[in-house]
């Protein structure tokens, strides 16, 4: 990866219908504020999307980092491993154990 490009990191996790609002709140008010407190200043943006299924809710997270070094600061040297705090694991049914990484080539604002 070109180290000067912004990096997009994606990951999915699934939880019960009942735990979905709990997990969403946890992401917004605990997980990502804690990441920022730990000094991961290169995390620029987090998008949280959901897809409702019959018995569960799928969460799709898209994180934007300024560099691959910031991704490593966030997730460690083995940065392809998923970052899932223990409190989040308790409310998730299952989750991807790895994250995907992409170089952001262009962002079009159409409004």
Report the location of each language-model feature.
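Glycine-rich beta-strand-turn "strand-cap" elements at beta-sheet edges
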Residues: 1-3, 44-60, 83-111
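Intrinsic-disorder/low-complexity regions
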Residues: 1-4, 18, 77
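Short, surface-exposed ligand-recognition loops at beta-strand->loop->(often short) alpha-helix junctions
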Residues: 14-27
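An amphipathic, aromatic/His-enriched active-site/gating alpha helix that lines ligand/cofactor pockets
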Residues: 30, 34-43, 64-101
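Residue-level signal for secondary-structure boundary sites
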Residues: 19-21, 69-71, 107
């Amino acid at each position: 990866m070109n180290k000067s490009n912004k990096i997009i990191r994606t990951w999915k996790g699934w939880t019960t219908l009942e735990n979905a609002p709990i997990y969403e709140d946890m992401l917004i008010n605990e997980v990502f504020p804690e990441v920022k407190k730990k000094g991961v200043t290169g995390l620029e943006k987090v998008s949280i999307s959901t897809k409702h299924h019959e018995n569960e809710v799928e969460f799709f997270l898209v994180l934007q980092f300024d560099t691959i070094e910031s991704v490593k600061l966030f997730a460690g040297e083995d940065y392809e491993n998923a970052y899932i705090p223990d409190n989040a694991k308790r409310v998730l049914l299952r989750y991807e154990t790895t994250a995907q990484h992409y170089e952001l080539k262009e962002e079009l604002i159409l409004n």
